[in-house]
Amino acid sequence: MIFINYYDEIKNELINNKITKKIKDYSKNKSDLTTYYNVGKLLKEAGKHYGEGIIKEYSEKLTADLGTKYDASTLNKMKKFYNLIKKMATVSPKLSYSHYVELLPYSDMDKINYYIKITEEDKLSVRELREKIMKIY
């Protein structure tokens, strides 16, 4: 049986993302999307083995090791992001991770795809996307 140290894998993903951001800001969005997808996947797998409480444990360790950016809420969003992306045919590189976070509360893929389309076409900022969603609902 192969044991994976999920915590070290998650920590390495996040450290590598920090390095990538410093080296080349151009690829930041793609790096963020890839990193947060991978972290979400690892969190889901770790949760299967160790229970859902692992997110809280990892958030405490990551906060101590890497800073306050990785609280339980943030890690839960990464896990939800992974679950959302799994359902999608393609991921738009035109949207930032923050755009996708605005769409996480929705389960209707038609609604999500609609907001992705208008965000791409109208080049909406995260704030503009949020306002558009609030106007419709």
What are these regions (language model features)?
Residues 1-137:
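Basic, low-complexity intrinsically disordered segments
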